[in-house]
Protein backbone atom coordinates (compact mmCIF):
# COMPACT_ATOMS: atom_id res chain seq x y z
CA UNK A 1 0.00 0.00 0.00
CA UNK A 2 1.22 3.49 -0.88
CA UNK A 3 -0.08 6.06 1.58
CA UNK A 4 0.43 9.82 1.66
CA UNK A 5 -0.02 12.21 4.57
CA UNK A 6 -0.71 15.89 3.98
CA UNK A 7 0.45 18.01 6.94
CA UNK A 8 0.85 21.73 7.54
CA UNK A 9 4.65 21.57 7.28
CA UNK A 10 6.90 18.51 7.43
CA UNK A 11 9.54 20.35 9.43
CA UNK A 12 7.12 21.29 12.21
CA UNK A 13 5.86 17.75 12.74
CA UNK A 14 6.64 16.25 16.16
CA UNK A 15 7.32 12.71 17.32
CA UNK A 16 4.20 12.56 19.50
CA UNK A 17 1.79 13.56 16.74
CA UNK A 18 -0.79 11.01 15.65
CA UNK A 19 0.31 11.48 12.03
CA UNK A 20 3.85 10.44 12.96
CA UNK A 21 2.54 7.37 14.76
CA UNK A 22 0.36 6.37 11.80
CA UNK A 23 3.26 6.73 9.36
CA UNK A 24 5.47 4.53 11.55
CA UNK A 25 2.74 1.90 11.84
CA UNK A 26 2.44 1.85 8.04
CA UNK A 27 6.20 1.61 7.41
CA UNK A 28 6.65 -1.10 10.02
CA UNK A 29 4.13 -3.20 8.10
CA UNK A 30 6.01 -2.81 4.84
CA UNK A 31 3.97 0.00 3.29
CA UNK A 32 5.26 3.16 1.63
CA UNK A 33 4.50 6.29 3.67
CA UNK A 34 5.02 9.67 2.02
CA UNK A 35 4.63 12.96 3.89
CA UNK A 36 4.02 16.31 2.20
CA UNK A 37 3.17 19.82 3.36
CA UNK A 38 0.25 21.80 1.98
CA UNK A 39 2.76 24.04 0.19
CA UNK A 40 4.28 21.04 -1.61
CA UNK A 41 1.26 20.17 -3.77
CA UNK A 42 0.92 20.98 -7.47
CA UNK A 43 -1.43 20.39 -10.41
CA UNK A 44 0.68 19.76 -13.52
CA UNK A 45 -0.03 20.18 -17.24
CA UNK A 46 -0.41 16.39 -17.37
CA UNK A 47 -3.58 17.03 -15.29
CA UNK A 48 -2.27 15.00 -12.38
CA UNK A 49 -1.57 16.00 -8.78
CA UNK A 50 2.11 15.96 -7.82
CA UNK A 51 3.91 16.77 -4.60
CA UNK A 52 7.40 17.33 -3.25
CA UNK A 53 7.30 14.59 -0.64
CA UNK A 54 9.53 12.85 1.87
CA UNK A 55 9.68 9.22 2.93
CA UNK A 56 11.82 7.78 5.72
CA UNK A 57 13.96 4.72 4.89
CA UNK A 58 12.14 1.41 5.17
CA UNK A 59 13.07 -0.22 8.45
CA UNK A 60 11.39 -1.42 11.63
CA UNK A 61 11.14 1.76 13.67
CA UNK A 62 11.00 1.33 17.44
CA UNK A 63 11.61 5.01 18.17
CA UNK A 64 9.40 7.85 16.97
CA UNK A 65 12.30 10.26 17.38
CA UNK A 66 14.46 8.14 15.07
CA UNK A 67 11.71 8.03 12.44
CA UNK A 68 11.16 11.77 12.56
CA UNK A 69 14.89 12.46 12.41
CA UNK A 70 15.14 10.24 9.33
CA UNK A 71 12.09 11.87 7.73
CA UNK A 72 13.22 15.44 8.31
CA UNK A 73 16.94 14.80 7.75
CA UNK A 74 19.32 13.68 5.03
CA UNK A 75 18.33 10.00 5.20
CA UNK A 76 14.89 10.70 3.73
CA UNK A 77 13.94 9.96 0.16
CA UNK A 78 12.93 13.31 -1.31
CA UNK A 79 11.00 13.00 -4.55
CA UNK A 80 8.41 14.77 -6.61
CA UNK A 81 5.78 12.04 -6.50
CA UNK A 82 2.57 11.59 -8.45
CA UNK A 83 -0.13 11.79 -5.80
CA UNK A 84 -2.59 10.11 -8.18
CA UNK A 85 -0.49 6.93 -7.90
CA UNK A 86 -1.08 6.65 -4.15
CA UNK A 87 -3.63 4.22 -2.79
CA UNK A 88 -4.60 6.46 0.14
CA UNK A 89 -4.14 10.16 0.86
CA UNK A 90 -4.81 11.25 4.43
CA UNK A 91 -5.52 14.96 4.89
CA UNK A 92 -3.86 15.52 8.26
CA UNK A 93 -3.28 19.28 8.10
CA UNK A 94 -5.09 21.60 10.53
CA UNK A 95 -6.51 24.63 8.63
CA UNK A 96 -6.83 26.73 11.80
CA UNK A 97 -3.05 26.62 12.27
CA UNK A 98 -2.62 28.48 8.98
CA UNK A 99 -5.53 30.90 9.42
CA UNK A 100 -3.42 33.99 10.15
CA UNK A 101 0.08 33.44 8.76
CA UNK A 102 -0.86 31.41 5.65
CA UNK A 103 -4.58 31.84 4.89
CA UNK A 104 -4.01 30.47 1.37
CA UNK A 105 -2.98 27.15 2.93
CA UNK A 106 -6.22 26.54 4.81
CA UNK A 107 -8.09 24.99 1.88
CA UNK A 108 -5.11 23.62 -0.03
CA UNK A 109 -5.43 20.04 1.22
CA UNK A 110 -9.13 19.98 0.42
CA UNK A 111 -8.70 21.53 -3.04
CA UNK A 112 -5.95 19.17 -4.18
CA UNK A 113 -7.52 16.26 -2.32
CA UNK A 114 -10.70 16.64 -4.37
CA UNK A 115 -8.76 16.24 -7.60
CA UNK A 116 -6.85 13.21 -6.30
CA UNK A 117 -10.18 11.73 -5.22
CA UNK A 118 -11.59 12.14 -8.72
CA UNK A 119 -8.50 10.37 -10.03
CA UNK A 120 -9.21 7.28 -7.93
CA UNK A 121 -7.21 7.89 -4.75
CA UNK A 122 -8.96 7.13 -1.45
CA UNK A 123 -8.86 10.53 0.29
CA UNK A 124 -9.55 10.64 4.03
CA UNK A 125 -11.36 12.32 5.55
CA UNK A 126 -13.50 12.98 2.48
CA UNK A 127 -12.50 16.45 1.19
CA UNK A 128 -16.07 17.44 0.37
CA UNK A 129 -17.08 16.53 3.91
CA UNK A 130 -14.15 18.49 5.32
CA UNK A 131 -15.15 21.55 3.30
CA UNK A 132 -18.41 21.62 5.27
CA UNK A 133 -16.46 21.63 8.53
CA UNK A 134 -14.09 24.54 7.93
CA UNK A 135 -15.41 26.24 11.06
CA UNK A 136 -17.32 25.32 14.20
CA UNK A 137 -20.70 25.99 12.55
CA UNK A 138 -20.45 22.39 11.31
CA UNK A 139 -21.12 21.27 14.87
CA UNK A 140 -24.57 22.87 14.70
CA UNK A 141 -25.58 20.44 11.93
CA UNK A 142 -25.75 17.62 14.48
CA UNK A 143 -28.88 16.95 16.59
CA UNK A 144 -29.61 19.54 19.28
CA UNK A 145 -29.91 16.77 21.87
CA UNK A 146 -26.15 16.19 21.83
CA UNK A 147 -25.08 19.86 21.92
CA UNK A 148 -25.02 22.59 24.58
CA UNK A 149 -27.29 25.60 23.93
CA UNK A 150 -25.43 27.87 21.54
CA UNK A 151 -25.53 31.39 20.08
CA UNK A 152 -23.25 32.42 17.20
CA UNK A 153 -23.11 36.16 16.54
CA UNK A 154 -20.97 39.32 16.52
CA UNK A 155 -23.61 41.38 18.30
CA UNK A 156 -22.53 42.22 21.86
CA UNK A 157 -26.08 42.90 23.08
CA UNK A 158 -27.28 39.50 21.85
CA UNK A 159 -24.42 37.80 23.65
CA UNK A 160 -25.17 39.67 26.89
CA UNK A 161 -28.83 38.67 26.74
CA UNK A 162 -27.90 35.05 26.06
CA UNK A 163 -25.47 34.96 28.98
CA UNK A 164 -28.10 36.55 31.24
CA UNK A 165 -30.69 33.95 30.18
CA UNK A 166 -28.19 31.24 31.18
CA UNK A 167 -27.91 32.68 34.67
CA UNK A 168 -24.73 34.62 34.01
CA UNK A 169 -22.49 31.62 33.30
CA UNK A 170 -21.42 30.75 29.75
CA UNK A 171 -18.46 29.92 27.54
CA UNK A 172 -17.25 32.32 24.84
CA UNK A 173 -14.92 31.21 22.06
CA UNK A 174 -14.10 32.09 18.43
CA UNK A 175 -16.06 30.49 15.61
CA UNK A 176 -12.77 29.67 13.91
CA UNK A 177 -9.83 28.30 15.85
CA UNK A 178 -8.59 25.33 17.84
CA UNK A 179 -6.29 24.35 20.67
CA UNK A 180 -8.27 26.17 23.36
CA UNK A 181 -7.09 29.59 22.13
CA UNK A 182 -9.40 32.51 22.95
CA UNK A 183 -11.75 30.53 25.21
CA UNK A 184 -13.38 32.43 28.10
CA UNK A 185 -15.53 31.23 30.97
CA UNK A 186 -17.99 33.96 31.92
CA UNK A 187 -19.33 33.84 35.48
CA UNK A 188 -21.79 36.20 37.19
CA UNK A 189 -18.92 38.02 38.89
CA UNK A 190 -17.26 38.57 35.48
CA UNK A 191 -20.07 40.81 34.24
CA UNK A 192 -17.94 44.00 34.45
CA UNK A 193 -15.37 42.38 32.12
CA UNK A 194 -17.85 40.91 29.63
CA UNK A 195 -17.53 43.79 27.15
CA UNK A 196 -13.76 43.37 27.10
CA UNK A 197 -14.07 39.63 26.44
CA UNK A 198 -16.52 40.22 23.59
CA UNK A 199 -14.37 42.94 22.02
CA UNK A 200 -11.32 40.68 22.19
CA UNK A 201 -13.10 37.90 20.30
CA UNK A 202 -14.97 40.00 17.72
CA UNK A 203 -11.66 41.35 16.44
CA UNK A 204 -11.11 37.93 14.88
CA UNK A 205 -14.65 37.26 13.66
CA UNK A 206 -17.78 35.61 14.99
CA UNK A 207 -18.25 34.49 18.59
CA UNK A 208 -19.71 31.24 19.86
CA UNK A 209 -21.56 31.77 23.14
CA UNK A 210 -22.31 28.42 24.68
CA UNK A 211 -24.04 26.96 27.69
CA UNK A 212 -21.55 26.02 30.40
CA UNK A 213 -21.77 22.39 31.48
CA UNK A 214 -20.99 21.96 35.21
CA UNK A 215 -19.50 18.52 34.48
CA UNK A 216 -16.68 20.34 32.67
CA UNK A 217 -14.99 20.80 36.03
CA UNK A 218 -14.05 17.12 35.72
CA UNK A 219 -12.56 17.73 32.28
CA UNK A 220 -13.63 16.13 29.02
CA UNK A 221 -13.17 12.83 27.22
CA UNK A 222 -11.66 12.48 23.76
CA UNK A 223 -13.19 9.40 22.12
CA UNK A 224 -12.07 8.37 18.65
CA UNK A 225 -14.59 7.27 16.06
CA UNK A 226 -13.49 5.32 12.97
CA UNK A 227 -15.77 4.31 10.11
CA UNK A 228 -18.69 5.76 12.07
CA UNK A 229 -18.12 3.49 15.08
CA UNK A 230 -16.22 3.91 18.36
CA UNK A 231 -12.61 2.96 17.64
CA UNK A 232 -12.11 -0.25 19.59
CA UNK A 233 -9.08 -2.49 19.26
CA UNK A 234 -8.31 -5.63 21.23
CA UNK A 235 -11.27 -4.89 23.47
CA UNK A 236 -10.12 -1.36 24.34
CA UNK A 237 -11.67 1.97 23.34
CA UNK A 238 -9.39 4.63 21.88
CA UNK A 239 -10.11 7.32 24.45
CA UNK A 240 -8.59 9.36 27.25
CA UNK A 241 -9.70 12.02 29.69
CA UNK A 242 -8.33 15.57 29.72
CA UNK A 243 -8.44 17.33 33.08
CA UNK A 244 -8.06 21.06 33.46
CA UNK A 245 -5.35 22.51 35.69
CA UNK A 246 -6.00 25.04 38.44
CA UNK A 247 -8.59 27.68 37.58
CA UNK A 248 -8.10 27.26 33.82
CA UNK A 249 -11.41 26.01 32.43
CA UNK A 250 -9.73 24.61 29.31
CA UNK A 251 -8.92 20.91 29.49
CA UNK A 252 -7.29 21.00 26.04
CA UNK A 253 -3.76 19.57 26.24
CA UNK A 254 -2.32 22.56 24.32
CA UNK A 255 -3.80 24.82 27.01
CA UNK A 256 -2.11 22.91 29.84
CA UNK A 257 -4.65 20.18 30.52
CA UNK A 258 -3.49 16.87 32.00
CA UNK A 259 -4.28 13.44 30.61
CA UNK A 260 -5.96 10.66 32.52
CA UNK A 261 -7.53 7.27 31.77
CA UNK A 262 -11.12 7.43 30.51
CA UNK A 263 -14.01 5.14 31.30
CA UNK A 264 -16.36 4.81 28.32
CA UNK A 265 -20.01 4.43 29.34
CA UNK A 266 -23.29 3.67 27.61
CA UNK A 267 -23.93 7.42 27.55
CA UNK A 268 -20.80 8.00 25.49
CA UNK A 269 -21.64 5.17 23.11
CA UNK A 270 -25.15 6.55 22.64
CA UNK A 271 -23.68 9.91 21.62
CA UNK A 272 -21.60 8.15 18.97
CA UNK A 273 -24.68 6.37 17.66
CA UNK A 274 -26.58 9.67 17.38
CA UNK A 275 -23.85 11.44 15.39
CA UNK A 276 -22.87 8.39 13.33
CA UNK A 277 -25.30 8.95 10.40
CA UNK A 278 -23.97 12.46 9.75
CA UNK A 279 -20.34 11.38 10.03
CA UNK A 280 -20.97 8.54 7.57
CA UNK A 281 -22.89 10.83 5.22
CA UNK A 282 -19.95 13.25 5.15
CA UNK A 283 -17.28 10.57 4.71
CA UNK A 284 -15.55 11.17 8.05
CA UNK A 285 -13.19 8.21 8.46
CA UNK A 286 -11.35 9.21 11.64
CA UNK A 287 -12.87 11.68 14.09
CA UNK A 288 -12.28 12.80 17.67
CA UNK A 289 -15.34 13.48 19.83
CA UNK A 290 -14.89 15.74 22.86
CA UNK A 291 -17.48 14.77 25.47
CA UNK A 292 -18.56 16.46 28.71
CA UNK A 293 -21.22 14.63 30.70
CA UNK A 294 -23.92 13.62 28.22
CA UNK A 295 -23.09 16.32 25.67
CA UNK A 296 -20.59 16.80 22.88
CA UNK A 297 -18.41 19.89 23.14
CA UNK A 298 -16.72 19.47 19.79
CA UNK A 299 -16.39 17.13 16.83
CA UNK A 300 -12.82 17.14 15.52
CA UNK A 301 -12.58 16.07 11.89
CA UNK A 302 -9.33 17.83 10.92
CA UNK A 303 -6.27 15.87 11.99
CA UNK A 304 -7.73 14.61 15.29
CA UNK A 305 -4.89 13.89 17.68
CA UNK A 306 -4.36 11.85 20.80
CA UNK A 307 -4.11 8.22 19.67
CA UNK A 308 -0.82 8.05 21.51
CA UNK A 309 -2.46 9.25 24.72
CA UNK A 310 -5.13 6.58 24.37
CA UNK A 311 -2.40 3.99 23.81
CA UNK A 312 -0.59 5.12 26.97
CA UNK A 313 -3.58 4.35 29.17
CA UNK A 314 -5.07 1.37 27.34
CA UNK A 315 -1.74 -0.27 26.41
CA UNK A 316 -3.00 -0.94 22.90
CA UNK A 317 -1.49 0.41 19.67
CA UNK A 318 -4.56 1.94 18.05
CA UNK A 319 -2.50 3.09 15.07
CA UNK A 320 -2.47 -0.53 13.90
CA UNK A 321 -6.27 -0.54 13.89
CA UNK A 322 -6.26 2.50 11.61
CA UNK A 323 -3.77 0.91 9.20
CA UNK A 324 -5.85 -2.30 9.24
CA UNK A 325 -8.86 -0.25 8.12
CA UNK A 326 -6.89 1.44 5.35
CA UNK A 327 -5.64 -1.93 4.07
CA UNK A 328 -9.23 -3.18 3.90
CA UNK A 329 -10.33 -0.13 1.93
CA UNK A 330 -7.54 -0.61 -0.60
CA UNK A 331 -8.54 -4.28 -0.97
CA UNK A 332 -12.21 -3.31 -1.45
CA UNK A 333 -11.26 -0.95 -4.25
CA UNK A 334 -9.32 -3.73 -5.99
CA UNK A 335 -12.06 -6.32 -5.55
CA UNK A 336 -14.74 -4.00 -6.93
CA UNK A 337 -12.53 -2.30 -9.52
CA UNK A 338 -12.83 1.07 -7.79
CA UNK A 339 -16.62 1.03 -8.15
CA UNK A 340 -17.21 3.15 -5.03
CA UNK A 341 -17.55 6.87 -4.39
CA UNK A 342 -14.93 8.24 -2.04
CA UNK A 343 -17.55 9.22 0.52
CA UNK A 344 -18.82 5.61 0.55
CA UNK A 345 -15.35 4.11 0.84
CA UNK A 346 -14.39 6.53 3.62
CA UNK A 347 -16.48 4.73 6.23
CA UNK A 348 -16.63 1.16 4.89
Put a short name on every predicted segment.
Residues 170-172, 207-210, 283-288:
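A short linear hydrophobic-aromatic micro-motif
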Residues 18-19, 156-157, 166-168, 179-269, ...:
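Phosphate-binding site of ATP-dependent enzymes
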